[in-house]
Every structure is written in structure tokens, then in C-alpha cells.
Swiss-Prot record:
GO terms for molecular function: rRNA binding; structural constituent of ribosome. Belongs to the bacterial ribosomal protein bL21 family. This protein binds to 23S rRNA in the presence of protein L20. One of its GO terms (cellular component) is cytoplasm. Disulfide bonds: none annotated. This is Large ribosomal subunit protein bL21. It comes from Microcystis aeruginosa (strain NIES-843 / IAM M-2473). Keywords: Ribonucleoprotein, Ribosomal protein, RNA-binding, rRNA-binding. The keyword RNA-binding applies. The gene is rplU.
Amino acid sequence: MSYAIIETGGKQIRVEPGRYYDIELLPVDEQSTHTIDKVLLIHDEDDISIGQPFIEGATVEGTVIQHRRGKKVIVYKMRPKKKTRKKRGHRQEITRFMIDSINYNGKTLVATAATSSAEVVEDSSDEEE
């Protein structure tokens, strides 16, 4: 299993090719590709590369699926024994980001096509019946 740890939006996220993640809002259009070059760690089977703080030449490429808003967080302030109450809500702007590949030293780590192999298994079980 190959994965990388990247930094985006002030947070560190463990990402794998072929999966999507909700990250802080990226200033790019939907359905466009984006490259993140702040890669802190890459784990490829038995090989681990750690940056100080980032790995030079390592990138994570992905596609912006959509821009959306996160769950609403309610902030409620109240002073006891007074009639002072404030209720406010906040919804964070987030981007759903699909990881396409992890690139390092000319090597590209891409997700395997698990869905196509699952379809083959379903087709072979139909033929047996």
C-alpha cells in the first residue's frame, strides 16, 4: 500500500491514490487538475522517504471534484443571570479532491483498477450458473 503525507490548508493529511479527501478550499475550478508539492513523507511498499520539512521533487496530483460547504458548527454564547444570548453558525468552505497519482524521483504511484477486476469476477460467476 502506497501513501503520502501532504500539507494543505495548514493541516497534514495522509493520502492514497484513487481516494478522495475533503480539504480546505483550493482556488481552482471544478474538474480541473491541481498539483500539491508540499509532500512531507512518501511510503511505497518497503521504501520510506521523509522530507526536512518537504521532499524535493515529490508531488501529489489530483482532480478537484467539487467545491462545497462543510457541516454547520453552532457557536452559542450566553451570560448567566442576564438576558444576553448570541447564536451564530459557521460553515467552512471545502474542496473534494481526488488523488490521481503520487510522483517521486521519476516514479509514479497510481491506484490500481479494483472496480474493473470486481466486474470480471461478477461476469465469471454468471457464466457458471
